[in-house]
Amino acid sequence: MTIRFPHLHAAIVQHPWAITPDRLQAIAEVVERRAEGIRLSASEIAALKGEREPNGVATLFSATTLDQVGVVGQQISVLGRGEGGSPAPVASVIAVISVFGIIAQHASEVDDISGPGGTSTERVMRSFRNALGDASVKAIVLRFNSPGGNVHGVQVLANEIFKARGQKPIIAQVDSLAASAAYWIASACDEIVVTPGGQVGSIGVYGLHRDVSKAAEAQGVKFTFVSAGKYKVEGNQYEPLTDEATQALQAQIDDYYRDFTTDVARGRGVKVSDVVGGFGEGRVEKDRVAVKLGMADRVATLDETLRRVASMKTSSGPRADHDTILHATADATEPDAPPSPPVDNPSGLQVSGNLLDASAPSATESDRDAFRRRRHAHRSRNG
């Protein structure tokens, strides 16, 4: 255990995090080893941080063939494959933005140190805005495999996504984990789809204080802080945490938790009490259980989601409400939703039967009724 670089250690563990506890411990372990002069290999860092991918950047897929297409220029202008292998314009694409690994506001600034194992909310924001503003992008899919991360920047990104509802379909594809801060962001999307075996949740916020005062004393080391300002060095790791400091930290944690649960309730179309007293107590739930609890809308793979989205016909119009946007297509496993003739979708979202997947679910009145019944049942269970 190190007693070096106290401010670096404090910056990591004491600030509020919306992340699974094992991942925060992994981050702290990296800091500890670095402070002790132990260098980690790239593979070791990757294992601790999670995915090693260029995160927060949009990957584009043709909305007619689902082939991945290239990006030309700084805006989203795409070229596909023409005859003889020559470039051919692609009229409509689906933008898939990856949110992998640990989330931080400026994670891109440390990519050169530890590899692209995290996701920057700022980078996701830029990619999202570009995709939203480009007429060639018919839908946006945020693909999640993240344990969460630091709370900073998460609420801003979630608000940006939520405000964009109704402009074009925005889908969260959980492939295979959206925990804590990742779920905060996902809940702002029109729809949450969980891949089979995937997990969502871990709604909560926490901080960590590590008291190494006795360890330092055992090593014959004493630290004396010279500071101005009553609370300037409050919570440092070389002194036990006082009751006053604990209360201040708890108040901050509670405030972030209120923001978190309020945003989730808004995004999922339920009451805050449904979240706080129900699925928002910190547990992670698996695919179909999450759907049953109202944490997600359906279970499907990324490929299935892309095919379904490709078969949708979108039109511009005023922002739709939570019950009439993508949720208009009920979960495929819903037993009490008999098929009926398709009707106009008030959100402007329709299904075209001559594209890719003729079996894709259509937006029907009974589908909407089934979704509302599930939502009412969820509200009834949770008071």
Task: Identify the meaning behind each predicted range.
Residues 1-383:
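N-terminal organellar transit peptides
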